């Protein structure tokens, strides 16, 4: 039987990706609550890629715990972030990890103190724009190269509407943890 589930949110990657498929704040809160309910009532481990960043200290990409190498050999910081300065056919993995885009990740992580807003693309698109520009990273999308501006523009509204809900939910979550900790100590 199933012992592990991992939920991923829609990521609007690609020139033709539709931003209106991103979950609404209400849908995201429902996922947050559902995953926590599953953990409390089901005998399986359930993880939510976006809503569980607190368990891994934020975004895992950029070589912190994860990276992506596409079919062309381009070393991307994330499977959803198709921007790079390095190709594994031309450098070592260590050299790729020291490339400008990976160093931008290293300098910026975590991208937000609110672990319900961990992603520099989805919840903090203003950061990804700057990171790609400072790094001079190029699109590595093999089908239809997309600019950082185009990618991030699809996330701006989502980030804006999610921020208020995420900040409230994060504050509540941290208050509950603090209250629980004070009663167990």
Label for each model-derived stretch:
Residues 1-58, 71-72, 76, 80-88:
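Radical SAM enzyme [4Fe-4S]-AdoMet core and its adjacent flexible, acidic
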Residues 58-59, 111:
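Short secondary-structure boundary/capping segments
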Residues 60-64:
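Short, small/polar residue-rich loop motifs at catalytic or cofactor-binding pockets
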Residues 80-185:
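Flexible mid-to-C-terminal extensions adjoining Fe-S/redox cofactors in radical SAM and related proteins
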């Amino acid at each position: 039987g199933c012992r592990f589930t991992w939920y991923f949110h829609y990521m609007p990657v690609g020139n033709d990706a539709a931003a209106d498929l991103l979950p609404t704040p209400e849908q995201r809160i429902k996922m947050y609550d559902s995953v926590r309910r599953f953990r409390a009532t089901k005998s399986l481990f359930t993880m939510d890629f976006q809503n569980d960043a607190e368990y891994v200290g934020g975004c895992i990409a950029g070589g912190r715990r994860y990276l992506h190498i596409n079919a062309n050999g381009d070393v991307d910081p994330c499977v959803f972030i198709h921007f790079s300065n390095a190709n594994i056919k031309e450098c070592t993995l260590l050299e790729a990890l020291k490339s400008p885009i990976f160093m931008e990740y290293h300098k910026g992580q975590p991208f937000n103190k609110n672990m319900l807003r961990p992603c520099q693309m989805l919840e903090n698109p203003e950061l990804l724009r700057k990171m790609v520009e400072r790094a001079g990273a190029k699109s590595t999308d093999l089908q239809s190269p997309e600019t950082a501006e185009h990618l991030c523009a699809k996330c701006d509204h989502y980030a804006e509407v999610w921020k208020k809900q995420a900040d409230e939910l994060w504050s509540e979550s941290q208050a509950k943890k603090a209250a629980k900790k004070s009663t167990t100590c």
